Amino acid sequence: MAFFFKGAVTSSPVKTRRQEAEYICHSLDSSHFSDSSFECFSTNPLTGSVCACRRSPRLLSNGYYVLTEDSFNTDDEGNVTLTPSHTSVTYKENLVRIFRRKRRAKRSLASLLSDMSQSCQSWLEGSVFRRSEPITPIQSSWEEFDHSYEKESPISFTYDPIDPVSSPDKLPPQTQLEEEEPQCDSCATHEHFSQSVSGLLDVPPPSVCHLDSYGSSSKTSSENVFMKVLLLILTLCLCIAISSGWLLGGVSAAVAFVVLLSSICVSKPGSSVRWRRAKTEDITSRNE
C-alpha cells in the first residue's frame, strides 16, 4: 500500500515533505472520475522496489488515517515515511434520516387577523358560553308581580264624611308636643314619604334626628376626653407638690381640682333633666 500520492486529493491530516526523486507516483489517468485514477505506483525507500496499490474512492470524501507514534519514520534529512503495519484507514458514514419532519405551512398575517376577529365575534354573540334561558331585567319581573297582585286582590276605597271626635283632654298635650317637637315629627314624615316613593331598593338619606343624636354622642365623647386630661394634669401637680415638699402647691392643686369637679357636676344635671323630660314626653305621646 502506497502512502504518498501525487496528483490525488486526500483528507489525511499528516503533512509530509517529499522529494520527487525518491517518491514518485505515476498516475495512469489524470481524470478523478475514472477507475484508473485510484491506481498508483510508489517506490519503497528502504528496499527500492516499486509497489502498486489501489486507493479507495471513499477516502476522497470522508476517509482519514489513524496514526500512532510507530506509524511514521523520519530520516536525517527530515523526510517522513509511513509504515503500513501501524497505519489504518477509517471512514465516516453519513447517516441519512429516513423519517423527516413535516414542515408546517406558514400562516399569513391576514389569516391570523381573521381568526382573531372570528373569536372576538363569538365572544360578543355569546356563542362560547351559551345560556339556556335569556336573562330578563328585574324591573319587568316586579311589574308583572304587581299586575298579578292587582288582578288577584281588588282594592276598594270608601269615604266616611264623619270625622272622629277627639276628647278635649287629649288636645292640649298633642298641641304642646307638636310645638315642642316639630322637628322629630317632620323627620318621621319625611322618612315615611321617602320610603313610600323611592321603594325598597333605594336607600333614604340620613334624617336630621339621626344627625342630632350623632352630635350629642360626639359632645359626650369630647367631654370624657377633657375630663381625663384634667385628671391627669391634677394628679401630676399633686405628685410634684408632694415630692418637692411644697405644701401650698398641693393645697392649691386640690382646691382647683374640687372647683372643677363641682362645676362639671353642676353643668351635667341640667342636661340630664332635659333629656329625661324629652324622653318622658316621647313616651306619653306614643301611649296616647
Swiss-Prot record:
Transmembrane portions of the chain: 229-249, 250-270
Keyword NAD: no
Signal peptide limits: none
GO CC annotation, single: membrane
Keywords carried by this UniProt record: Membrane, Transmembrane, Transmembrane helix
InterPro entries: TMEM71
Topology in membrane: Multi-pass membrane protein
Keyword Transmembrane: yes
Places the protein is found: Membrane
UniProt similarity note: Belongs to the TMEM71 family.
Name of the protein described by the UniProt record: Transmembrane protein 71
Name of the coding gene: tmem71
